Amino acid sequence: MFLLYLFTSFAAVSGVLGSSPSYNGLGLTPQMGWDNWNTFACDVSEQLLLDTADRISEIGLKDLGYTYVILDDCWSSGRTANGTLVADKEKFPNGMSHVADHLHNNNFLFGMYSSAGEYTCAGYPGSLGHEEEDAEFFASNGVDYLKYDNCYNKGQFGAPETSYKRYKAMSDALNKTGRPIFYSLCNWGQDLTHYWGSDIANSWRMSGDIYPQFTRPDSRCPCDGDQFDCAYAGFHCSIMNILNKAAPMGQNAGIGGWNDLDNLEVGVGNLTDDEEKAHFSMWAMVKSPLVIGADVNHLKASSYSIYSQASVIAINQDPKGVPATRVWRHQVPQTDKYGQGEIQFWSGPLDNGDQVIALLNGGIKPRPMNTNLEEIFFDSYLGFEQLSSNWDIYDLWANRVDNATSANILNNNSVGNATIYNATALSYKDGMAKNDTRLFGTKIGSISPDGLLNTTVPAHGIAFYRLRRST
């Protein structure tokens, strides 16, 4: 009954708002930015945030769209006698307003963190029961984004309505401040968040915490396969584990409210280049937030060239806002040392009539893979124009910035003469309308109504294409 109420109320609200499906007008495309947790955890400071922001700007990532700088847990030293949150003066000697001002003056947006519990996950003061005063603290300090966790929640979970009410309290408090604040739930998908998240928030985590492994199982992430409704979400979840859990959820996300598959592990740990490309591509394709988890001051050239791949980012920022669908998934006999091995095909519509597709190889050996128009346009039927048209195939990674150019940018702390896309000067939407070639990849062939798209996909890798109707 609660879920039926949510669907009914959302439909009514949508009818009133009309022009925007977002509950607060934010999140019309998935958020992009940087969060300190994956690399630095509690080792946070004013200097870290400001130096990171400067670096993101200097190497062109801000102009690619990575505009949120998000301070995660461990920033507080407690509360005053009247209950107001206090920033740790050793870590943040000039206070949070100073951080916000510096970021805003450099065209960034400032994110902070709390938990819908008595404490945060690291044991600092949480916001459960303090929603209004904490929302006012965030607003008065110029915060533009709140990541809201799920630790120490005093048992207030176990049914969708219970979790919904706990998270709605902060949603209402943020809205009451009058400041536009992007609201990012981090409740690990507990209590079917994908059903009710968009009613009160702009994004919601849908699994346990990620770690930089492509397929490796971990007992601390107990649910596997397509088990998206986990009683215990855990942490140390691999990239493929999270992706498989997300597969059925795309139908519940869209403009204003996004499934969050967790921060990006590109440049974190020891993922291969093919694994990092597949990870970034799939997060982009399912319209997950693109939040950098790496130390951008010590980024490999190859990882930088992934984060700066505008043709892939354009898939994520496509104004149609429709997450791709997994069309098929098959196990393969060539498994890795963890017993993991599978192949998948994903497809999704784009704003201008294009289609994005991915052939994903989770096996340990390079593999010939193919697809056809019936699979690509899986919801079409005989007689549909999509199935009777010829389509040009564009490789979304073929125009990737080479490692030498990337290294030069990183070493010189400047984009210089490199042709890195600038979404500040020309948005992805406008760039696509103007047919900016950097957003479409490189044409490699075409497919006819009765043809096959054939390719060889590397181990733990991806073939990632945009299809455009032939003219």
Swiss-Prot record:
Class of this enzyme: hydrolase
Disulphide linkage map: C42-C74, C121-C151, C221-C237, C223-C230
GO terms for cellular component: extracellular region
Q: Tell me a Gene Ontology molecular-function term this record carries.
A: alpha-galactosidase activity
**What catalytic activity does the UniProt entry give for this protein?**
Hydrolysis of terminal, non-reducing alpha-D-galactose residues in alpha-D-galactosides, including galactose oligosaccharides, galactomannans and galactolipids
Q: What are the recorded Gene Ontology BP terms?
A: carbohydrate metabolic process
Binding locations of substrate: D72, D73, K147, R205, Q251
Its Enzyme Commission number(s) read 3.2.1.22
Q: Is Membrane included in the keywords of this UniProt record?
A: no
Q: Which UniProt keywords apply?
A: Disulfide bond, Glycoprotein, Glycosidase, Hydrolase, Secreted, Signal
Per the Swiss-Prot or TrEMBL record, the active site comprises: D149, D209
The signal peptide here is 1-18
On assembly, the entry states: Homotetramer.
The name under which this protein is listed is Alpha-galactosidase
Q: Which gene encodes it?
A: MEL
